[in-house]
C-alpha cells in the first residue's frame, strides 16, 4: 500500500480521478480514497491545510492503512530564484521555518527532543529523480521548509532565507508529515510544484497557478507510483 497526501482539494482531485476500484472511507472528518493507481494499491487523502491537520491525517493514514511509503504532493512557494511556476520540487530533507526553541540549546527550526531535519528516503528520492529524468521534466532536489503561514510578502521570504539560505521552497504541511512518518518509521518523500514565488504577488500567483502546480505534482506522483 502506498500513501499519498495532499492538503487541498485541487491537489488531490487529479489523482482521485485516476483511481480504479475506489472506496471512500471517512475517519475523524478526514476522507481517505482507497483504490488502484497504475495497478498499485494506494490510499489518497486530503489532509487539510497546516501542520496539525497534516499530522492528524498522516497518523490516521499510517494507523489505519499501514502504508509502506508516504508521498506528499501539492504546491509550494519558491524561495530559490532559479525556480519557475510549474517546476517540480523534490525534498532531500525538510524542516520547520517557524520553530524556535533556541533558548534551550536547540537549533532554529528544531522541535525539542526531535531531529532538526527529516531526511527523505534515499530509495524514493532516487526513483523520483529517475522518473523525472525519463520524462525530461524540470525537477530540482533540495530543502523544503514548512510553517503555519502563507508566505506572501518579500519580507517574510527574506526572513526565511536568512535563517535557511539553502531552502528552495516553502509550504505548510510537509515537515509535519515527515515528522509523523519519522515517529512511525515509515519512509516518505515530498514532491511538489511551484505555484508562486513567495513574494508580494504570491497570493495572486497562487490562485492563478494552483491548478498548473497541482497537475505537475500529480503527474509526478502518478509516475512515481508506477515505478514502485
From Swiss-Prot:
Pfam families documented for this protein: PNP_UDP_1
Known EC number: 3.2.2.9
A GO molecular-function descriptor: methylthioadenosine nucleosidase activity
Enzyme superclass (EC): hydrolase
Keyword Hydrolase attached: yes
Keyword Cell membrane appears in the UniProt entry: no
Family in the record: Belongs to the PNP/UDP phosphorylase family. MtnN subfamily.
Protein name listed in UniProt: 5'-methylthioadenosine/S-adenosylhomocysteine nucleosidase
Lineage, top ranks: Bacteria, Bacillati, Bacillota, Bacilli, Bacillales
Amino acid at each position: 500500500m502506498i500513501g499519498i497526501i495532499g492538503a487541498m482539494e485541487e491537489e488531490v482531485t487529479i489523482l482521485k480521478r485516476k483511481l480504479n476500484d475506489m472506496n471512500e472511507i471517512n475517519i475523524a472528518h478526514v476522507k481517505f480514497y482507497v483504490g488502484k493507481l497504475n495497478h498499485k494499491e494506494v490510499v489518497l487523502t486530503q489532509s487539510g491545510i497546516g501542520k496539525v491537520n497534516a499530522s492528524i491525517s498522516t497518523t490516521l493514514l499510517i494507523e489505519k492503512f499501514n502504508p509502506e511509503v508516504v508521498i506528499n504532493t501539492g504546491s509550494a512557494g519558491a524561495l530559490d530564484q532559479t525556480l519557475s511556476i510549474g517546476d517540480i520540487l523534490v525534498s532531500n530533507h525538510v524542516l520547520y521555518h517557524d520553530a524556535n526553541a533556541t533558548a534551550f540549546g536547540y537549533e532554529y527550526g528544531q522541535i525539542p527532543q526531535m531531529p532538526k531535519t527529516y531526511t527523505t528516503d534515499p530509495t524514493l528520492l532516487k526513483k523520483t529523480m529517475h522518473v523525472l529524468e525519463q520524462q525530461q521534466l524540470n525537477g530540482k532536489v533540495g530543502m523544503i521548509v514548512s510553517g503555519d503561514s502563507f508566505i506572501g510578502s518579500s519580507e517574510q521570504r527574506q526572513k526565511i532565507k536568512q535563517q535557511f539560505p539553502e531552502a528552495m521552497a516553502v509550504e505548510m504541511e510537509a515537515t509535519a508529515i515527515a515528522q509523523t512518518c519519522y515517529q512511525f518509521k515509515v519512509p516518505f518523500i515530498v514532491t511538489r510544484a511551484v505555484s508562486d514565488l513567495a513574494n508580494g504577488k504570491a497570493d495572486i500567483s497562487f490562485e492563478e497557478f494552483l491548478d498548473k502546480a497541482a497537475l505537475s505534482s500529480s503527474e509526478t506522483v502518478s509516475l512515481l507510483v508506477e515505478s514502485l
